[in-house]
């Protein structure tokens, strides 16, 4: 990640390798990415933001956006691109709980934690009622939960961690009951689905289309300009 190039893979315990598109992730947002961002509403939380191309593009558009990632290198790269980011798991406390307008799970990040149901439940707690989730799904119809290592095909880094791979149909199955379909599409060989939360907000405040990012805890390169903490 720090080098900005691969090859890197997720390696399953049976030896199967899933290539990671490090070069694309470390580049600027491409036309497919920008189309996704055009669909975002209000404040945007990019879960598993990686090197931050999407957060940086949103910031360049003047949008209130925050990336989160467990990788320090990813957070640092996001900041260098001009975005705002926190080193944090999606399952930890977030600024603006229950008030985000859009949550992104791009680049297969619906697999975070290896439990799609738990992740979708968590996202409902982050979004305002009726908030938008945009998820990038696997290019093929698959529904698997695995344990993986990050590897360059020769050596592995860190401990194994749980991951999931979902096609669009599998995602829609997991979403039944708590989510409404808001669209699905394919672009540039990539597949996406949009869902609307049906959950009620735990926040006592009404949903507002204003920044929900805490300036005390967010790394930023905005010359010290505060981002309102609602």
Give names to the regions the model predicted:
Residues 1-39:
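S-adenosyl-L-methionine
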Residues 41-50:
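Conserved class I S-adenosyl-L-methionine
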Residues 71:
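Conserved SAM/SAH-binding beta-strand->alpha-helix loop
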Residues 82-92:
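Conserved SAM-binding strand-loop segment of SAM-dependent methyltransferases
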Residues 91-103:
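A short acidic, Gly/Pro-enriched loop at the edge of an enzyme's catalytic core
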Residues 111-122:
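A short, conserved alpha-helix within the catalytic core of class I
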Residues 130-138:
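Conserved beta-strand signature within the Rossmann-like core of class I S-adenosyl-L-methionine
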Residues 160-178:
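Short alpha-helix
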